[in-house]
Amino acid sequence: MENPQVCECYHGDVEEEKKKKQNNTTSPVHVVLKIDFHCDGCIARIVRLSRRLEGVETVRADPDSNKLTLIGFIMDPVKIAEKLQKKSKKKVELISPKPKKDTKENNEKKANDKTQTVVAVTTVVLKVNCSCDGCIKRIQKAVSTTKGVYQVKMDKEKETVTVMGTMDIKSVTDNLKRKLKKTVQVVPEKKKKKKDKDNAEVNTKVGSPCQPGNGCTHGIGPYRFMEGPMTGFFSEEDQSYCSVM
């Protein structure tokens, strides 16, 4: 824009309720916002939206610096900026007065809480008599309309309905009973079988399989002692002759 223009508009008639709120503050507040102005129509639209905000009496738009000044008995400048951003669908930045650190920390905590909130998805199996296609359609419609239901699976042979989502199980069963006028049972989950430790055999013997109980010999047999008279080692004819030799 070649010729910067300053648009100043005054809010005329003020309702009595707004006057009572204005009396709570001693002096008007100057709120400076940064917003992108594209054309004259954009300026007029933003000024018109700003005049409708609570507590705003005077609006000054400076297209050259992309600043919008709101003057009035404004209780919360942060909320004013948020409302204007929501209505104008443009990015609005609060320049002054600067928000307190406490409000910034609270907003950051709220944002973190929203991102960290994880909803647990549960799966429940219901036993319902569904003998015909009409019953199946009615069951699917009744379950799918329940709040928090993500997925519905039907098993006609087993007559079971598997429901997945963040719903309340009691609300699902009550809804089915009321709409179908049939008995609805919750199928309990199967518990995993524990291993029988008593039947497990524990080998406590030490030694090789061929020689149990003799200990580890590392391939060398145990030492043996030859019993008997020493004369057995010698010849009967010549006792000085050694049979070992």
Swiss-Prot record:
Say what the protein does.
Heavy-metal-binding protein.
Keyword Mitochondrion recorded: no
Q: Which GO terms describe its molecular function?
A: metal ion binding
Record CDD domains? HMA
| Basic and acidic residues biased stretches | 99-113
Domain HMA as annotated: residue spans: 28-92, 121-188
List of residues binding a metal cation 1: C39, C42
Propeptide at: 243-245
Which PROSITE patterns did the record assign?
HMA_2 (PS50846)
- State what protein this is by name: Heavy metal-associated isoprenylated plant protein 1
Q: Which family does it belong to?
A: Belongs to the HIPP family.
Organism ancestry: Eukaryota, Viridiplantae, Streptophyta, Embryophyta, Tracheophyta
